[in-house]
Amino acid sequence: MGVSLVTENGRVFGAGLALNEEEIYYIPVEGMITEGYLCGKLEELLHKVSESNTENIMKSNTDDVKKDPENEISDVNTDGTLKYDKKCVCALDVKALLKHIKSDDPMAVFDAGVAAYLLNPLKSSYTYDDMAKEYLNGRILPAREELLGKKTVEKAWEESAEGLAAWACYMAYTALACRKPMCEALCDTGMWNVYTQIELPLIFTLDSMEKWGISVKSEELKSYGEKLSVRIGELEKQIWQQAGEEFNINSPKQMGVILFEKLGLKGGKKTKTGYSTAADILEKLAPEYPIVKDILEYRQLTKLKSTYADGLANVIAEDGRIHSTFNQTITATGRISSTEPNLQNIPIRMELGRLIRKVFVPEEGYVFLDADYSQIELRVLAH
């Protein structure tokens, strides 16, 4: 069965269900169908799939299947073809489902998005219409933009109910229909074990990490923001004093006029919109001109304040933790990335930047472990 859950900002609007490639339905959350009821029924479905697969494995005659040293029962027949009697729920993004539906069985699901990523990790996005074109014999399906335009899900729910239903159904259909060709492609490219043994279980691990979150000392974060505000105010006055007038330091156009016309700094590059005040230009001038050094520090601190001090404070949940999103299908190298917020690029070079890391704390009785493979890609290639 193919499943798509239509969600936005934690709210569930409906679900697309593809029983097969001909029977596809949309169930909106309305009337007696509440979010809890719909998600509960989908959770029951996943549980039944898990139970069914467990029973089949127990009854399976191991002489009829090809043994895999890493698994008790293989998904491959003795002739090398894939078995499709194993039931599963197919989705474009299983982790998105797990935010609303509980399950701990990787073998009960098929994630078309992760499969598409393994087959072509260089793509920037994996949409259902792209998958259909590539894995369903060039089939053309209307893209999200064609069905909903630029509307949010909530806006589409209010104004384009038919388009929203079609979108949900196309996603469910694509996830189901792509299962066989994608699995065959994973086998052909030698990626089947990577998918089943690494990427599929990782979905559930990342989901658990997101739900658990990381503890933050909110008061220290607030204090950090106040320290930044004080220093930013000091720099602002210093810059205005050196410039001889007040101006908008965040305006490249105004800054360019001040630096390269009024103060006559050398090295200015004029464009159609004014002088360039890009970091690489200013960094060359900083050793000679104190005002430029102050401007660079001002930029760094205002970014720290908006992105980290204020930005992180705004995403602390009621449980006092930050629940980031971890992505496994974005980087071409397979590295996990973090968004909403990004916890992987918190600065460490500046003293004020290092302070931000101290607001993250482990659970009582635990410590943070910092582990890294040194130059792992080069070492693997050399091996």
What are these regions (language model features)?
Residues 1-32, 80-88, 92, 147-354, ...:
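Conserved "right-hand" nucleotidyltransferase catalytic core of DNA-directed polymerases
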Residues 42-43, 357-359:
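A generic local secondary-structure boundary/capping motif
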Residues 54-55, 62, 70, 144, ...:
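Intrinsically disordered, low-complexity regions
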Residues 107-108, 349, 359-362, 383:
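Short, surface-exposed loop/turn microsegments at beta-strand edges and helix-strand junctions
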